[in-house]
Amino acid sequence: MTVTQLRSAGRLAQLAGHVNGARQFSTRPALRKELQDAYILSAARTPTAKFNGSFLSVSAPKLGAVAIKAALEKSKVPVEKITDVYMGNVLQGSVGQAPARQAVIFAGLPKEIEATTINKVCASGLKAVTLAAQNIQMGLSEAQIAGGMENMSQVPYYVSRASGLPAFGHVKMEDGLIKDGLTDVYDQFHMGNCAENTVKNHNITREQQDEYAIQSYRNAQKAWEDKAFADEIAPVTVKSRKGETVIDTDEGFKDVKFDKIPSLKPAFVRDGSGTVTAANSSTLNDGASALVLGSKAIAQQYGSGSRVLAKICGYADAATAPIDFPVAPAKAVPIALERAGITKDQVAIWEFNEAFASVILANSKILGLEGAKVNPLGGAISLGHALGSSGSRILTTLLHQLKPGEYGVAAICNGGGAATALVVQRVESV
């Protein structure tokens, strides 16, 4: 028998063994790891600047770098323990390649640290935190950084390469901020129109929205007066021809005339039935926030004395029809609570993103949170809504309010019809 014939015979015998069930499988037991607990060791945020305000010349990644650097310093975690950074960033036109990577390098972190940019619209920053938490829970990393960043003031206007530009004459441009940040792609109208739909579906009045907005501003003003944000703020040094200016305070909460709010015209529906105005909606802003997450071992070693040390108890995403995005948190929150093993009555403080006053009013109504501590220090209406940062910003603010033992929930809706929610418990030590 030739060599070729021997090989063929061996192959036939092998195939026959498969057919007759003689195939051999490994008897080694599968490797299994128990899910680990993930903790938050520190959280920091830049002030939130007004649209075309103090951060006009500071890119989103550079704002992110300030937040990352501050959070890392507060955490006491050695930088060599950090393996990955996740940063939310929504409006990436003209920001440059890999915004999260830029933030890592601008923060002075080692170039060996991997970075990933997350775009889940307004929920980007909170989604970034859940992704980092998953890596730690699965034992893939000891420590990670997560957060978000946005500079809405720097978003460019667009001219499509496929527009067939004329040799001469006028050229039509699109506002990148409206197109990629503020418009429902499917119905082709503003996010505010979705809020108007929520108002009608849940019988929310103009007066209720205005009252909520006024309370948001008053809460924010009192919070700043009481220095409630002092521990979470990472000042930003802005350079200009006149020298350097240190920005250490949110810019929008003072700019309100309460007597004018009830008389403002609706901003989105102008047929006489609209109720959503510039005052009872969030503002356009620039800012960043970041948190350091670690395993139980990291929390035990470096978490002592942390102002915000907390265990991540559960989190969830949920989706709705795009037009119903304002009430998506009401779907995500119950799932997150169930995964955390607690009920809503055990939650001490709730932080919902105030995209619109109607978002808080509708979700509070659906979830039965009337009378609960919701956004006690103000929210996106008064403090600002820097899209990619907002999810991690509300979590940062939540953590600085909780006392050891207390549970808190951060929840945020996002364009396209979805939301992310996260449950934490403050702990004194691990």
Swiss-Prot record:
Transit peptide stretch: 1-32
Spans through the membrane = none
Which residues are noted in the entry as K(+)-binding? Y217, A278
EC top class, as a word: transferase
Q: What is its EC number?
A: 2.3.1.9
Q: Where do the catalytic residues lie? A: C122 (acyl-thioester intermediate), H385 (proton acceptor), C413 (proton acceptor)
| BP-aspect Gene Ontology terms | fatty acid beta-oxidation
Question: Its biological function?
Answer: Mitochondrial acetyl-CoA acetyltransferase that catalyzes both the formation and degradation of acetoacetyl-CoA. Seems not to be involved in ergosterol biosynthesis. Plays an important role in growth, morphogenesis and maintaining mitochondrial function including the response to oxidative stresses.
Please state what the protein is called.
Answer: Acetyl-CoA acetyltransferase FG05087, mitochondrial
Q: Which organism is it from?
A: Gibberella zeae (strain ATCC MYA-4620 / CBS 123657 / FGSC 9075 / NRRL 31084 / PH-1)
Output the lineage of the source organism.
Eukaryota, Fungi, Dikarya, Ascomycota, Pezizomycotina
